[in-house]
Amino acid sequence: MLHDHPSVGPTAILTQFGAIFVSLELSRSNWVLTSLSPGNGEKMSQYSLAAGDIGGLLARFAELKRKAKERTGSDYPIITIHEAGLDGFWVHRVLQNEGIDSYVVDAASIATSRRRRRAKTDKIDGEALLRALLAFKRGEPRVCAMVVAPSPEEEDRRRLCRERQTLIAERIIHVNRIKGLLFAQGISDYVPLRRDRRKRLEGLRTGDRRPLPVHLKTQISRELDRLELLLDQIRKVEAEQEALLAAESKAAPEGEPHNAVAMLLAVKGIGEHSAAILWSEGLCRQFSNRRQVAAYAGLAATPWRSGAVIHEQGLSKAGNPQLRTTMVQLAWLWLRHQPQSALACWFRARGERGRKGSIVALARKLLVALWKYVTHGVIIEGAVMKPAA
């Protein structure tokens, strides 16, 4: 689609176009469009729209196509790019439904100036996005990282796991707040998650044998109200998650591959919550190799090798945080429930030195092994399966 050819002019781009290229700089207040059209002197044009004005956006695209046809006598398709961010994927889906070739890019993967104080405007960002799109369509390697947009069903399916994690984090906050308030009064044995929490609150005495102050007791009572609401919501979310897993893990029809959720649940040491996160956050997607799997979870290494300087910077963490956290937790559980597996033996052979780094390496190896197991049916060496129900 793109062919190099000489051009004149200091701001001309050395490319012959077979399409109209548009970058979208999205924000809460307005959208900035940067376009590059055939027959327009190879100059970038910019337009501004109100945020969310999808009708105005499509009208602008129609105008760009009309002007390009007037100049060249040919119809050209539109190719767009915008950063993954606050707007999610709804704009991308609208454009695809309109027959527009749309790309979503990881903003952190686009090269920028490394000066400590660099200019940053919507105009500069829009032009940088457009240059990245042109290079990507020319087939240049490592230009940027395009995001694979999930389907609406995939996006909705992972809501339950994420909502549960949010509720658990809020529960921890309330429990710690209650414990902190009471510890300041010399009370260290109160457990807010016990069923008799209300009854025990009435009988509490401070470290100097006084009844709880009135306002403190009232505050803790309100904290318990919020805590109990959270506990009820967690139970409801977990019930929905169990129902979804039950539907996903039903036996596949004869002649079809086994269901991935059922395969994960069959492995000893993997429970319903871990299986739900593994499937909805990672293993439901398509990967070409193990490096892509590790990179998607943010478990890939980041070496620094320049001349005589060679060292490791640690994990990139440029990936799915829910999947990464779950895999590190699952790695510890794997050592407990699968001590005779090849992965556990590999971990023990490394000894106590570098235990923190080793558990992350085990998490990476385990994720790759589970991916091979789910997608290709490769049994994890030495792994024990749960007994059939």
Language model segments and positions:
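A detector of single, family-specific signature residues
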Residues: 1-389
